[in-house]
Amino acid sequence: MKKILTLTIAAVLVFSLVSCAKKDKEDVTTGTSAADVQKNGPKSALEILETVWKKYSADDKFAAMGGSEKNMKEDAPGEFDLGDAEALDFELGFPKAEVGKLDDAASLLHMLNQNTFTCGVYHVKNSADIEALAAKIKDNILARNWMCGFPEKLVIMTVGDYIVSVFGAAELISTFTAKLTDSYGSVRQLFDVPIA
């Protein structure tokens, strides 16, 4: 009886390990590599944030939420509704008068305090507007009156026709920018300024 039980347990263990190994191998072969992402470029603002967020280890991740009220996600980035210019300005610091220059947006925020980490990614309709629009985002964020602590740093970058604006605690911003740069070889930094 003990032999049968031992053989049964051993068989279950072997099948479990084989199944896990096969699943891991499938994930690696069907996943999108960083080279593919860089070669093809991002397809949406949300894709940029999801690609970066997947690079975070469990230790690097923080309590997060993303998206506008209609598209809110917990512990993940989300799409931001461009129809709500007030929320885009209030939550992400994007100047509401400039919303017409966008056709896509996504966000990732620290769930407990947005001054700790706030990131907005915006697809600009006309690439000629990118640098001027990035400067307006910077000015709009720096002109804010802060409550519940000051963010330490603001960084604005581009990935193709996308503007990535991120502000908050210096350590979290540095981690994010490193992972963004690792994900997309076309990242170009436009601004890196202290806030507090």
Regions found by a protein language model. Give the residues of each.
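Repetitive helical segments and hydrophobic/amphipathic motifs
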Residues: 11-12
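C-terminal motif of bacterial Sec signal peptides marking the signal peptidase cleavage site
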Residues: 16-19
